[in-house]
């Protein structure tokens, strides 16, 4: 699964009976640190969890931030004003390859990744 090579993935496995693939997700931010060694991706999970913590009651959307470290081969192309697309995260030559394909095209390779935060909120369409 996409989260297997990411540190601090225990919580996501606890709140989902089956963690969904990252298909057609709303992407809030893709940020590259000034020195180019870290990329953070913030996006909404495509499905609300079936076992959310009690403090999330009343919410309908989960936001997740993943930070990737020691970045190479970074590419980014905007096709639309709003960012959404499929996010594919997989093992690649003992590193982590990230590919975003949708209204934004982004790809890069990282040596490590960690889930920095997960939070819930009410998304209004």
Residue ranges and their predicted role:
Residues 1-125:
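Surface-exposed, interaction-prone regions used to assemble/regulate multi-protein complexes
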